[in-house]
A protein has these predicted regions:
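C-terminal tails and terminal domains of large nucleic-acid-associated
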Residues: 521-558
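Conserved beta-strand scaffold positions in the cores of enzyme catalytic domains, especially
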Residues: 14, 122-124, 195-197, 332, ...
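Solvent-exposed loop and beta-edge segments used for protein-protein assembly and interaction
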Residues: 22, 147, 294, 463-465, ...
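Short glycine-rich phosphate-binding loop at a beta-alpha junction
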Residues: 96, 389, 551-552
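Hard-cation-handling environments
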Residues: 205-335, 339-522, 529, 534
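His/Asp/Glu-rich metal-coordinating catalytic cores
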Residues: 2-74, 79-292, 311-325, 344-347
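A glycine- and charged-residue-rich anion-binding loop/surface
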Residues: 20, 44-48, 52, 69-70, ...
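Conserved hydrophobic residues forming the short capping helix/wall of the S-adenosyl-L-methionine
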Residues: 111, 405, 540
Length: 558
């Protein structure tokens, strides 16, 4: 961190690029003088009405406009909502990456898939270490979360210290590694902290979050209770500690383990290579080897805990999985809670599994990876910030944390419930939102990044709801007379064979519309198409009370 007396009067800028007011797409820029450091680079998953969209990533126009200032991306942990946008963002903002060992391992697998390893500088940082990036010094502080190697960040600048918790919980008995370094939070608090940016996800939940080890005891009880059944457990692929406890319990009860789902296989492979998973020899087998073992000696760890249609468990439930079929008596354990918005999809999968005779367990086999109210209070009490900036979560979650901060004695004017794009300037004397930068959501559809916008989504929704009717006709170039057609083609509107009378009337409506244009000397194709669109649309609405997309196609021959 550079020290310059001329800079002491400058203010630190905090600019959330994404991740506020929604779950996912976490990214925050810290700017001081000629230096910008970006914390996290996450994606969000599409809403149900974003038809055909694969991923949503943040708009980084501000970073591109200030690319000479950007010193690097620093990561709090390896979840997709914190690292998932990297392959897309690095094509426009290619700067060095800094993260802990497992986080960087997951990032490197992602970069390898996209052929970006050689072009990207990376550095592994251990908890307790610090790095210097321009005007900033950034210290990595050990925390606990639902993935190993999670850290908080103490961001030092000439304007003061900002503590960013990342996603965290206080777990005194973690499955892997050490407990959260509360002592370091307290030591930094004694130095004087300008602002605390704290995880808000569970700010509405009273008390403390349960330790991850309690899930291990639940697994032990369930394995003992269902000792004569095949067990299938769906959980988040990134929850390495959860996977470790499943493997430990399977080993205790003499069961073999099969891993299904691409993301689950990839993360378990990476975590095992880096030493974050301890898998007893001969415990893991390939799915093809299951037939060699009785059901009561098998455990499957699978993706699909959120009801994702293409995940392994969903494909098993709908008979679409090529290698695993659900049998009556199978015990299916959902070791997760539905993310808000996924409840209907999860319920659908549970119903499909139940109809196949499986025993589905979806309670008491999960604990949250996020701090509840008492843990949030503990961090505030240790850090003692001047300003509170709730992050991570929906607006109501951030509002709930703001209330906690106020109850702990932070002045209301020093609590900032920000929106993505807000520019907060602060120093020891004052803090204020002084403006906004361009932010937003970039939609990823296959290989296309940002080429699908609201108009395309609206068209897709229109097609999904009411279908399409295409009117095709051929005109003589010089006279404008109809030579062939109109032919009516329908998809997703009515079944043509059962609506021949309607289609014949529709042809007549199009023909009448064209004759009107010819008699009134309307020769502009755009106006002709609008006439067809209006008259056919009005006719179909009167007859069906539906408004399909209407696509007139006019061809011209000599």
């Amino acid at each position: 961190m550079k020290k310059d007396k001329n800079n002491e009067s400058m203010k630190l800028k905090v600019i959330p690029i994404g991740g506020l007011g929604l779950i996912g797409m976490n990214m925050t820029a810290f700017e001081y003088n000629d230096s910008i450091v970006v914390v996290d680079c996450g994606l969000a998953f599409p809403e149900n009405d974003m038809l055909g969209i694969d991923l949503v990533i943040p708009d980084v126009t501000y970073l591109k406009e200030n690319i000479d200032k950007v010193k690097g991306f620093v990561f709090t942990h390896g979840h997709e909502d914190h690292i998932g946008a990297l392959p897309y963002i690095l094509k426009e903002v290619c700067v060095p990456l800094y993260g802990t060992k497992l986080t960087m391992g997951l990032i490197e697998r992602k970069l390898t898939e996209h052929g970006m390893m050689r072009s990207t500088k990376r550095k592994v940082v251990r908890p307790g270490q610090s790095i210097n990036l321009g005007e900033f010094r950034i210290e990595f502080i050990k925390t606990n979360h639902s993935i190993a190697d999670a850290v908080a960040l103490a961001i030092y600048s000439p304007a003061g210290i900002v503590v960013h918790t990342g996603d965290f919980k206080v777990d005194y008995t973690p499955v892997f590694g050490d407990a959260i370094d509360l002592q370091r939070f307290a030591e930094i608090g004694k130095k004087g902290v300008l602002a605390l940016m704290c995880d808000s996800t569970n700010a509405e939940r009273p008390g403390f979050s349960a330790s991850e080890r309690t899930v291990g005891r639940t697994f032990d009880n369930l394995f003992a209770e269902h000792s004569h059944n095949r067990i299938i457990i769906a959980t988040f692929a990134s929850n390495v500690d959860r996977v470790q406890q499943i493997i430990n319990t399977a080993d205790k009860y003499g069961r073999k383990v099969v891993v299904e789902g691409r993301s689950m296989v990839n993360i378990i492979s990476t975590a095992s290579e880096l030493g974050y998973l301890n898998i007893p020899e001969n415990t893991l087998i390939e799915v093809e080897q299951m037939k060699n073992y009785p059901d009561e000696k098998m455990v499957l760890i699978t993706t699909g805990s959120q009801g994702e249609s293409m995940a392994a468990l969903s494909r098993m439930a709908s008979n679409m999985h090529k290698k695993v079929s659900i049998k009556p008596g199978d015990t299916i354990i959902f070791s997760s809670n539905p993310i808000p918005g996924n409840e209907k999809a999860v319920s659908k999968v549970i119903n499909e599994l139940s109809m196949k005779g499986a025993n589905v367990i979806f309670q008491d086999a999960h604990v949250s990876g996020h701090a509840c109210q008492e843990e949030i209070k503990l961090i505030y009490s240790l850090v003692k910030p001047k300003y509170s900036i709730p992050v991570h979560g929906e607006y109501r979650h951030m509002k709930a944390q703001g209330k906690i901060a106020e109850n702990l004695g932070i002045e209301k004017d020093n609590i900032f419930i920000m929106k993505a794009g807000d520019v907060l300037e602060m120093d020891a004397n004052a803090a204020k939102v002084v403006g906004r930068v361009q932010v937003g959501s970039i939609l990823v559809d296959g290989l296309g990044v940002g080429d699908v916008g609201n108009i395309v989504l609206r068209d897709r929704q229109h097609l999904a709801e009411d279908g399409i009717v295409i009117a095709v006709l051929t005109l003589e170039k010089y006279t404008g007379q109809i030579l062939s057609g109109p032919d009516i083609v329908s998809r997703g509107f009515v079944y043509v064979r059962e609506a021949e009378d309607l289609m014949e009337e529709a042809r007549q409506v199009v023909e009448d519309s064209m004759e009107y244009c010819i008699s009134h000397h309307i020769t502009d194709w755009g106006k002709m198409k609008n006439s067809i669109r209006d008259s056919l649309g009005e006719f179909l609405w009167k007859r069906t009370k539906r408004r399909p997309m209407i696509l007139p196609i006019i061809m011209e021959v000599e």
